[in-house]
């Protein structure tokens, strides 16, 4: 009889189900693992044999063949130890292991070690196989217990896993764990946020227009570029935006944790949306991601999914990187294709850029002379193509900073966050599945209702500035967010006027 327990391996960022099969034949004693198993799985033979013998199990004097199916799929990870050990320990018992999954690296004493790399696999299994029963390390219970629709049995030792399989009446652990974060409830769904502001907008002096643009961008996930002289507060404003972004659903928190684990970062839960800030010298693969068949890694763009991607000194990024941004900015996905592999990442993020007006930075200064020649200014401006700029919703030229300026509007991060929460509620009450800045054409028609005055103003702007269809949709979406910040059901003339004022006209 061939017994089977299921496990999984990560392939191109997705969990692929693996059937772990075992047969025992009368022949010279041997222990063979087949099915494109890498060295970490091959080394399981020593760990499993020692763990069984140290727990009073007689290792069978037979030829043991472990097959990992499908055989053409490369597999890796020490978490295959547990299913292999269970199949060997239960060789003489006829048990039905249908829909049973087991994950865990064994110590030589049989204890199951923590392994946060299992998390992305469990997350995918919960979605694709809602009836699956999973045995996982007790040490990772705090991390795994939040995954919805997952029947999980947490064990500390190999013997506990064995007992669970031999006693099917044992119930899965009930997960009552809740995240210790602030919440709001909308449409019977909880959203999590933080009311701790490590950086506060009240510290920003002057720059009322830029602060308002930051508020609108945060509330609707609208792409933003701030342009101004060095030291005027561009980065200061953008670094504070991360603390006023909209709250997250549980699924978004889980997805962000999955991405961090895949990129070999920490596995903690956070009530803040991800904030990625790559340096201008970063390589193309580090920003776009790797599509290597063996170890694909998400890049900065993928890690910013559902969060914020900040490019400081925007024109100094490589031209091919800036042009590669056009697809994820427009379609909210990034496809990386190679000869032997292809991987797709979700990329619904808020893009924010900061730039000087010229190479020396003094073009907009009222006190310093610009040292650039006209040709240099033109070359600098041309680093950002028109198709790229057309994907930017909000463009602000900031005034030169003045030490004597008082904090503008007396806006604090807490106040701005409350307005963002108000706009977020308006969007969710309309049953929107996406932020205003990410609405498609059909959703724009449905949710972006203009009154007569706003419609007339938009038509005049289209005729005067020759706006593209993309630009028109961008203006409508920004106006929708401005209306939400004012708790207005329809887009009015004042909202449209403000949205047009933030549009970069060629």
Language model regions located:
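Active-site phosphate-binding and catalytic loops of NTP-dependent enzymes
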Residues: 53-62, 92-100, 226, 249, ...
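Short loop/turn elements that form and flank the Walker-type P-loop nucleotide-binding site
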Residues: 59-62, 96-97, 129-130, 219-221, ...
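Walker A/P-loop
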Residues: 224-265, 331
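Residues immediately C-terminal
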Residues: 108, 309, 316-317
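Peripheral, non-AAA+ core regions of ATP-driven protein-machinery
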Residues: 1-225, 232, 236, 270, ...
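Basic, amphipathic alpha-helical bundle interface domains used for macromolecular binding and assembly
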Residues: 34-45, 60, 67-77, 293-296, ...
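Conserved alpha-helical scaffold flanking the Walker A/P-loop in AAA+ ATPase domains
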Residues: 215, 269, 274, 282-309
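Walker B catalytic acidic pair
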Residues: 228, 306, 312-314, 324
């Amino acid at each position: 009889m061939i017994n089977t327990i299921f496990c999984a391996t990560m392939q191109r960022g997705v969990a692929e189900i693996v059937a772990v099969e075992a047969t025992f034949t009368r022949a010279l004693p041997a222990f063979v693992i087949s099915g494109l198993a890498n060295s970490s799985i091959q080394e399981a033979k020593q760990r499993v044999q020692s763990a069984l013998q140290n727990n009073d199990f007689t290792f069978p004097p037979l030829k043991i063949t472990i097959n990992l199916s499908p055989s053409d799929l490369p597999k890796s990870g020490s978490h295959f130890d547990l299913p292999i050990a269970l199949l060997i320990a239960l060789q003489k018992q006829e048990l039905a292991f249908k829909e049973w999954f087991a994950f865990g690296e064994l110590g030589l004493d049989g204890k199951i070690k923590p392994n946060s790399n299992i998390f992305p696999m469990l997350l995918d299994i919960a979605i694709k196989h809602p009836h699956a029963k999973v045995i996982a390390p007790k040490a990772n219970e705090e991390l795994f217990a939040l995954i919805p629709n997952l029947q999980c049995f947490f064990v500390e030792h190999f013997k506990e896993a064995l007992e669970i399989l031999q006693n099917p009446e044992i119930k899965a652990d009930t997960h009552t764990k809740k995240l210790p974060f602030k919440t709001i409830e909308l449409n019977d769904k909880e959203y999590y946020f933080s009311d701790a502001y490590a950086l506060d907008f009240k510290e920003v002096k002057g720059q009322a227009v830029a602060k308002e643009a930051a508020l609108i961008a945060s509330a609707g996930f609208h792409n933003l570029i701030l342009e101004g002289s060095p030291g005027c507060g561009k980065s200061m404003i953008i670094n504070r935006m991360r603390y006023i972004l909209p709250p997250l659903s549980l699924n978004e928190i889980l997805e962000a944790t999955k991405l961090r684990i895949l990129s070999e970062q920490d596995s903690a839960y956070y009530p803040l949306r991800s904030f990625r800030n790559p340096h201008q010298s970063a390589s193309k693969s580090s920003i776009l991601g790797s599509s290597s068949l063996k170890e694909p890694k998400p890049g900065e763009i993928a890690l910013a999914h559902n969060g914020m991607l900040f490019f400081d000194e925007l024109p100094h990024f490589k031209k091919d990187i800036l042009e590669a941004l056009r697809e994820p900015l427009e379609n909210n996905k990034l496809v990386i294709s190679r000869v032997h592999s292809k991987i797709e990442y979700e990329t619904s993020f808020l893009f924010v850029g900061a730039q000087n007006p010229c190479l020396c930075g003094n073009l907009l200064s009222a006190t310093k002379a610009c040292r650039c020649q006209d040709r240099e200014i033109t070359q600098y401006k041309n680093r950002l193509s028109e198709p790229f700029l057309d994907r930017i919703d909000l463009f602000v030229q900031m005034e030169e900073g003045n030490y004597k300026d008082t904090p503008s509007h007396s806006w604090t991060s807490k106040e701005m966050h409350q307005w963002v929460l108000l706009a977020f509620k308006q969007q969710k009450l309309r049953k929107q599945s996406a932020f205003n800045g990410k609405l498609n054409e059909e959703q724009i028609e449905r949710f972006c209702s203009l009154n007569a005055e706003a419609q007339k103003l938009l038509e005049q702007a289209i005729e005067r500035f020759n706006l593209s269809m993309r630009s028109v949709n961008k203006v409508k979406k920004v106006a929708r967010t401005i209306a939400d910040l004012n708790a207005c059901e329809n887009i009015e003339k004042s909202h449209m006027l403000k949205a047009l004022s933030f549009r970069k006209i060629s």
